[in-house]
């Protein structure tokens, strides 16, 4: 008889975990508070599958920059201090992670997981015929406005054999739509990819339904993880107990509400925003994915749409749209790609990205014998989802992991 796994949360990480587990022979129950999966942080994110450019937000240059950003209305990072111990714990952990040695170590952890994720998605596409989510291998160009930031990036390439330094003229030759922006150079990674994260969630949910080994409960909120000694028995949903041999917590930033006594998740939501523009024959949208490094804006051509995403707001738990931030994003995007799409028809969105202070997700055991975590991916949720799901399925199935798991669930990370 197949072992039963209950997964809390049907965003891209939860769905990818369910898919990996079903492929390994488990029976899965997926519980999602919304009416279907992929409607929260996975709905309209940046769309870039950025496997080799995975540097954590916690960087040695950020503390000094942040002091200047606090005084600017157009800053890519905004902090609104609150009387919230969780926010201050997270900020202190973030500052500690900005040390250069820790940043490099955490970037190495992320790169291992990202490359596994790329291989895993390729396996699923080739072996299972998974498609229908506007996937393309279109490459990525990280473009720089400031000579100093360009110089630092050239010195810290994650994979010099797969990344290429370009002059301003070479950037323009690669992507002619950049003609309106004063970039001084860029770093090109040809094998990066792009896709529609929400459509990917829909495809995974349909495949899981067709498998006969995944029960999906939508519009149902888990109110409690039920413990029993050194293990957990299952989850409580609407007063009913759903028993399981294993429980996976993948509910994004809301996961902290469900942690058991004595355990605390080092998570905080980083609010981000996106615009999605229709692209017609009269427009000049970039075909290559673009990251405007100095403004911290990403651009991704997803089918006949241009997705523009940006900003890190550490402002609490309100997921609502903020007109001033969206107006700033619209203005900066129009300055960079004035003919990039129909700005008047842009669809606005905001999402709450669950992040750890280090930027490295928590993928592994959650302090009880059969409680597992897959969360804290920050802005890299789509990029890391398939690899994280595969890695957790291997751990639950007691199989040798595909990569070294060092750093993915550090000792003491869950201390209450």
Curated annotation (Swiss-Prot):
Pfam families: DAO. Gene3D superfamilies: D-Amino Acid Oxidase, subunit A, domain 2, FAD/NAD(P)-binding domain. InterPro entries: DadA, FAD-dep_OxRdtase, FAD/NAD-bd_sf. It comes from the Bacteria. Its cofactor is FAD. GO terms for cellular component: cytoplasm; plasma membrane. GO terms for molecular function: D-amino-acid dehydrogenase activity. SUPFAM superfamilies: FAD-linked reductases, C-terminal domain, FAD/NAD(P)-binding domain. FAD binds at residues 5-19. Keywords: FAD, Flavoprotein, Oxidoreductase. The keyword Flavoprotein applies. Its EC number is 1.4.99.-. The keyword Flavoprotein applies. Disulfide bonds: none annotated. It catalyses: a D-alpha-amino acid + A + H2O = a 2-oxocarboxylate + AH2 + NH4(+). One of its GO terms (biological process) is D-alanine catabolic process. Belongs to the DadA oxidoreductase family. Oxidative deamination of D-amino acids. NCBIfam families: PRK00711.1. This is D-amino acid dehydrogenase 2.
């Amino acid at each position: 008889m197949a072992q039963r796994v209950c997964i809390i949360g049907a965003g891209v990480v939860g769905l990818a975990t369910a898919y990996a587990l079903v492929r390994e022979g488990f029976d899965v129950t997926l519980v999602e508070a919304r009416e279907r999966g992929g409607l929260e942080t996975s709905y309209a994110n940046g769309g870039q599958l950025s496997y080799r450019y995975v540097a954590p937000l916690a960087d040695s240059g950020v503390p000094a920059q942040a002091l200047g950003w606090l005084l600017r209305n157009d800053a890519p990072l905004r902090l609104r201090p609150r009387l919230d111990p969780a926010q201050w714990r997270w900020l202190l952990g973030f500052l500690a992670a900005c040390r250069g040695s820790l940043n490099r170590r955490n970037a190495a952890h992320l790169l291992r997981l990202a490359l596994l994720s790329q291989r895993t998605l390729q396996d699923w596409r080739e072996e299972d015929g998974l498609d229908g989510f506007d996937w393309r291998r279109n490459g990525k160009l990280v473009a720089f406005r400031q000579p100093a930031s360009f110089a630092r990036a050239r010195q810290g390439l994650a994979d010099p054999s797969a990344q290429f330094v370009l002059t301003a003229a070479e950037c323009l030759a690669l992507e002619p739509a950049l003609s309106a922006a004063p970039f001084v150079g860029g770093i090109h990674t040809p094998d990066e990819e792009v896709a529609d994260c929400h459509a990917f969630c829909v495809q995974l949910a349909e495949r899981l339904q067709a498998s006969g080994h995944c029960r999906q409960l939508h519009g149902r909120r888990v109110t409690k993880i039920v413990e029993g000694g050194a293990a957990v028995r299952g989850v409580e949903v609407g007063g009913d107990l759903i028993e399981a041999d294993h429980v996976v917590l993948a509910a994004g930033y809301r996961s902290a509400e469900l942690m058991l006594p004595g355990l605390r998740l080092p998570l905080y939501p980083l609010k981000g925003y996106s615009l999605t523009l229709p692209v017609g024959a009269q427009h000049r949208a970039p075909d290559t994915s673009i990251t405007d490094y100095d403004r911290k804006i990403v651009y991704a051509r997803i089918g006949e749409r241009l997705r523009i995403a940006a900003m890190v707001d550490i402002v609490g738990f309100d997921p609502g749209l903020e007109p001033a931030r969206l107006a700033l994003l619209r203005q900066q995007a129009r300055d960079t790609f004035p003919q990039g799409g129909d700005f008047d028809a842009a669809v606005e969105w905001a999402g709450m990205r669950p992040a750890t202070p280090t930027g490295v997700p928590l993928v592994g055991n959650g302090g009880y014998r059969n409680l597992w975590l897959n969360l804290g991916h920050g802005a890299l949720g789509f990029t890391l989802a398939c690899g994280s799901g595969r890695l957790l399925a291997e751990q639950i199935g007691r199989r040798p992991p595909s990569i070294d798991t060092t750093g993915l669930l550090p000792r003491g990370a869950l201390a209450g």
